[in-house]
Amino acid sequence: MGLCVRSSINIPYFHYAMIYLDNMGRLKVMESPSIQEQNETVFTTEVRERFLEILGAKVGYQPPMVRSIYDPQQPLGCLSYRQTKRDRNSPAHSMYGVPPSVQFSAPVEESPSCGSVDMVGLEIGDTPNVLDYYERSLKHFRQVNCRQILKTFIKFIEPRKQAKHPYNGGKPPAGAPPGKKGDPEKTKPEWWPANVVHKEPDHLRKDRTCNPSENLQCQVTLLTDLERLSLLIHIIRRLGRFGITTDQLQEIAHDCKRRLSDPHKLQILDEVFRVRRIEERYERGEVDANKIVYVVNRESNQKEKDGDSNVDPDQKHEQEDDNAREALPILHSEKNSTSPMSNSAEHTGMAAPSRPMNMGGDRNQLFPLPEWPSFGETPQDDRIFFPTTSKYTEDYASQQMPRTPATTALVSTNETHAAFDYMTQESITSSSPEQTSHHRQAPLPMQHSASLDPWTPTFRHNFFNPMVYSTAPRHAMSQATMLSQFPRSTTSHGQEMPHMAHGLPNLPQDRPSSMDGMSMRGPSFRTGFLSHPCDPSQQAPHSSGCGHPDSWTQNRPHV
């Protein structure tokens, strides 16, 4: 409840309530804070109307012509709207199924308004101002409520409208070409206004086009909403000759109160119907054109004004859906133009890393070498994934991100060696301290069995990432040179291992002689055939080795 309007009158009491008319003829109320704390008001709508009725001719107020069920002057033969619904097909009814003598017989339930109401006078003979009042009041009633009320009114006025007056224009005329639809304007009922297109109230805002060069979308939306308001005002004011009375429309509006977004706004329609009754008296010549009707000045309270009266929430969702449909081709083209790496990242459900590698002067190298992992840091904390961008597409275009078989998560380039080549040790090609200190050696993360040779060359072929040697001749030759510098004998290898600076433990020297050949075979793995391991000694000198640590069993005689 809003705060009361204070006046210059100083009331020396703690509890009070006052109703008055100011110098402008506006109805005002004032209540003490003790009453306002209860979120209620003493001056309900009935009290305010009674106050104006008592003043009567002094303020030019006429009581509303609403008959209630407890009115002793109501005729006994009067029937309500609910009683006449079952008798619509009776011959006594008019052509639109409503008898003109039906009276409004149910009491209108009105919620109490706030403690302070600003009311203004409306001259009933000033038709443009009266029409403007109808339009402004229905805007505060909200468009979503207007659609609901309109559908209920149309169903009451024309119960079989889809059969008699379809919105789609009905069947096309005889001899029409295939695909031609009927004209909705030709099936428009007689009571429908001529300046409103024959559309269902939910679709009056559609089927409007404008010049794309002119930004008139908001104006087009406003015009369609005005058409809906024009249809509602026409039904309220111009259907008396078809047997539709204001009392019937008011009762129908209260019947669909629960379907409104804000049932309390129904009091706006009650005031509209009250003004319409006085306007009917003016049309019949019962009152003069100077008759003043006091209505609520809703424009003075901007908080009550519906900011979405012109564009309701349903219309906003439909506009967003239309914009989304227009954006689909753009998104589809952008998706097709992305790099292969971004597509692979989207396929695995993870974002590709967009952080550049620090490659120094070798930025043009086709196969950039990642930095060696430092176990003094926590690599997991540095795993930051960002959405893929095309900024570094040139650096990552020829590099495939490795993926473990057990998970679909991508491994960053800084963790490639730590994730797959954890047993790989850097070869020492020179004894100069500048070259040896350039590479950081990583200790063996776990103790392996003595039956396996823990030493593997640096350039071990990664079967997860096939490499085309023709694209990087300089890199391939440098790795082959490094391989040729290692001795192939088991004696030299066993003697040099304790003196290497790679941090490997001193393995037992008393291993079986049948396993000495393992040091000459390099990296080994199965080719997929369990009974036929591949011997790397039968391959080319610089090709990647294949086989299995148990491949020494092939020297045994077959049974």
Swiss-Prot record:
Residues 169-179 have a biased composition (Low complexity). Pfam families: AFUB_07903_YDR124W_hel. Residues 180-189, 300-325 have a biased composition (Basic and acidic residues). Keywords: Cell adhesion, Virulence. Residues 163-190, 298-351, 427-451, 525-559 are annotated as: Disordered. Induction: Expression is regulated by the hypoxia responsive morphology factor A (hrmA). Residues 336-346 have a biased composition (Polar residues). Signal peptide: none annotated. InterPro entries: AFUB_07903/YDR124W-like_hel, AFUB_079030/YDR124W-like. GO terms for biological process: cell adhesion. Part of the subtelomeric hrmA-associated cluster (HAC) containing genes that alter the hyphal surface (such as reduced total chitin or increased beta-glucan exposure) and perturb inter-hyphal interactions within the developing biofilms, resulting in a loss of vertically aligned polarized growing filaments. Consequently, this hypoxia-typic morphotype (called H-MORPH) with altered biofilm architecture leads to increased hypoxia fitness, increased host inflammation, rapid disease progression, and mortality in a murine model of invasive aspergillosis. This is Subtelomeric hrmA-associated cluster protein AFUA_5G14920. It comes from Aspergillus fumigatus (strain ATCC MYA-4609 / CBS 101355 / FGSC A1100 / Af293). The lineage of its organism: Eukaryota, Fungi, Dikarya, Ascomycota, Pezizomycotina.
